[in-house]
Amino acid sequence: DRGGIAGGDGQTHHGLLDIAYLRGVPNISVMAPKNEGEMRDMLFTMIEHNGPAAMRYPRGNGVGVDISREPELLEIGKAELMRDAGEVAIVAYGSMVHPSLAAADRLSKEGIEATVVNARFVKPLDAPLLLALARTKRLIVTVEEAYLAGGFGSAVLELLEENGLQDRVRLVRMGIPDRLITHGDPKLLLAKYGLDADGIYNRVRESVELLDERRTKPQRVVS
């Protein structure tokens, strides 16, 4: 409960540390749903799973999806490909999936196509999918409502390094910086740290423009 920004409850109630400390628990499965429908799926999956598991979900309301269907058993460590396009991949965890989809729609209108992945799991990661993205995209942007240190983006970076792909693709990590977060309205705080649709759109666009500049800039020849 209260995974992520929870400023309405006071600055000591933000749930920003859980990804980092839960990743260190051996053999645990750690997950976060994109909405209330997937939350039911994850609760069902945790009940059926033979092993330790943890799920984070945010304070507040759902996004309004239909929850009348029977819950679905999810494959542990399997992400969901929400959108497949272009040379950019936005890999979002939990509450950041829907803002990432909105950002991708806006980017598409400007000619920047982006794949969007609902990571679902931070442990275990969907290594086959993430490594495939690293080999086929030129930019991966991870988005999480948690501290960057030891978080979801760090887990992805570790995976790329372990497979020798850290220099194959540009990785940009979006999340909460290394500072104490004040009390405040969650929507305003998320916007302040660039973790809403506008912030994700701006960061992806800036990153693409930077890569384009590097691609067109003449390379120096050292004799």
Region annotations inferred by a language model:
Residues 27-28, 52:
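A structural motif
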Residues 2-15, 48-223:
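Thiamine diphosphate
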